[in-house]
Every structure is written in C-alpha cells, then in structure tokens.
C-alpha cells in the first residue's frame, strides 16, 4: 500500500499567547509534501483562535484543566487520520518532514517515527543542548 499525505495530520498543541506558534504553523504549512493540520488547546484565547483562522486550520478546544498528557491525547483524538504528529507550539519542522515520514510508514517494524532536532536560539539553529 502506498501512503499519501492525506494519511497524516499535524496536531498542534497550543497554550496561551505563545510567541512561537506562528513559526510552528508556518513550518507545517510550508511542507514540500502537504499534510492535514489542526490546532488544539486547553487554554483558549484570541491569539490561538486567530492564528488558526489566519491559516484556515481547524481549531479544537478541550474543556477541563490543562494537562499535557490529556491535551496530547485530545489532539490525537481530534484527527481523522491513521498517522499523527503531535507538534508542540514551539516546534519548527524541516520542510521535508512529511516527505520523509511517508517513506517510512510502510515499514511494519516502525511504530514510532522520531526525528532529530536542533534548538533555535535567536532565530538560528544552535547546538543540541542534551
């Protein structure tokens, strides 16, 4: 079976007025291979709602106390695809992320896809801090 970009969703978990949210969303919108994107929050505010509207992204609000475990599970439950990347509001993805992910989905041994990272400091990629 060949997997398509429509088999995957980025579920962005957003909290309050994050200054990084738009950078995260732009990195998802600018993927070379397009994918579904949703924004989820347990701390609704105009900043998050307006950002979702600006990029025409479905927006979901979880009721109850903000809790990262429950929030991430909620974001996965809001998707309609078999493959989900939970993206935190301060994550920025390489433009080839979805392209590379789709290459590895057919591997039956793969149950989780982990990508490398570089921390951004002052808008520039820095050295790994762990």
Give a label for each model feature:
Residues 84:
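Short aromatic/hydrophobic "clamp" motif used to bind/position activated sugar donors
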Residues 1-27:
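N-proximal low-complexity "stem/linker" segments adjacent to membrane-targeting elements
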Residues 40-49:
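A conserved acidic beta->alpha catalytic loop
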Residues 88-92:
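The conserved acidic donor/metal-binding loop of glycosyltransferases
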Residues 98-129:
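Conserved donor NDP-sugar-binding/catalytic core segment of glycosyltransferases
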Residues 63-79:
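Glycine-rich, basic loop-to-helix element that forms the pyrophosphate-binding segment
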Residues 26-35:
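Short, acidic, metal-binding catalytic loop of nucleotide-sugar glycosyltransferases
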